[in-house]
Amino acid sequence: MSKHVAVLMGGWSSEREISLRSGNACAEALEGEGYRVTRVDVGPDIATVLTDLKPDAALNALHGPAGEDGTIQGLLEILKIPYTHSGVLASALAMHKERAKTVMRAAGVSVPEGRVVNRHDAAKSHPLTPPYVVKPIAEGSSMGVIIVREERSHPPQILASDEWVYGEEVLAETYIAGRELTCAVLGDRALGVTEIKPVSGEWYDFDAKYAGGGSIHVLPADLKLNIYQRVQELALTAHQALGCRGVSRADLRYDDTPGGTGALVVLEVNTQPGMTQTSLVPEIAAHAGLSFGELVRWMVEDASLNR
């Protein structure tokens, strides 16, 4: 009898629609690999739904709060359902950007300088000397990220408005110029490095990530061999320092601008990266010789408790 996999998707975070795309793509691929699949749009009744389903494993395709912060992982541990990706502690650590930086810095990984501030204080006066970046403590898909340029005399006022829905605390970080890089990690190995070039704008924002033609992915990234290898080393070190399991993706900046610092820093580690067939991790896996079906099969066969 084929293994029964519950693919968890949707949820109620701001990344719900992205999660539905990831979940449906994974479910379709698993069906193609011969698994019995139930698509589960996660809601408040998720404990009852999973108790009734009794799946052999859960593929976690959720993004954002509740899906990648240790919450759903804790529930799956309680219900004794083996699951994919990282466990409770690693998920909670990686989701909280400042605490993740503390752990990575202790492991020797270069991260941007920054500080946590109240959003209202950040709207009154610059928390750092521009240019800097303001971002929510625990969101993905570049939700709520603001770049404050040198020429900006006043800090972003949206931080103090009712339009800001990403929590009371924000992270202000020194802006790192240069190239946007990302590296996929699968288990105990770094699969490869992609450079991301937004078609419009200077950075990889929500539209560049998800709008058709919003960005160009250069795979493998055109880097000197020692830099390419260093990116992979940093991604793997960050993955291991945070205690990640299964698949993760590290996002980095490399400042090779004329007169730049040459800095290579890890911005964050995503424990629940996008999983459509055209998402970054599946692209990198395909370049490494792993089809999308083989990738999701590996993830399900790697599923376990106590992650």
Swiss-Prot record:
Residues bound to Mg(2+) 2: E268, N270
Annotated compartments: Cytoplasm
GO cellular component: cytoplasm
Residues given in the record as ATP binding sites: 127-182
Catalysed reactions, as listed in the record: 2 D-alanine + ATP = D-alanyl-D-alanine + ADP + phosphate + H(+)
Cofactor binding mode and count: Binds 2 magnesium or manganese ions per subunit.
SUPFAM superfamilies: Glutathione synthetase ATP-binding domain-like, PreATP-grasp domain
Listed EC numbers: 6.3.2.4
Cofactor(s) needed: Mg(2+); Mn(2+)
Keywords for this protein: ATP-binding, Cell shape, Cell wall biogenesis/degradation, Cytoplasm, Ligase, Magnesium, Manganese, Metal-binding, Nucleotide-binding, Peptidoglycan synthesis
Binding-site positions, Mg(2+) 1: D251, E268
Pathway info: Cell wall biogenesis; peptidoglycan biosynthesis
Keyword Magnesium: yes
Annotated ATP-grasp domain residues: 101-301
GO molecular function (one): ATP binding
GO biological-process terms attached to the record: cell wall organization; peptidoglycan biosynthetic process; regulation of cell shape
Family membership noted in the UniProt record: Belongs to the D-alanine--D-alanine ligase family.
Function: Cell wall formation.
Record-linked NCBIfam families: D_ala_D_alaTIGR, PRK01372.1
Protein name: D-alanine--D-alanine ligase
Organism placement in taxonomy: Bacteria, Pseudomonadati, Pseudomonadota, Alphaproteobacteria, Hyphomicrobiales
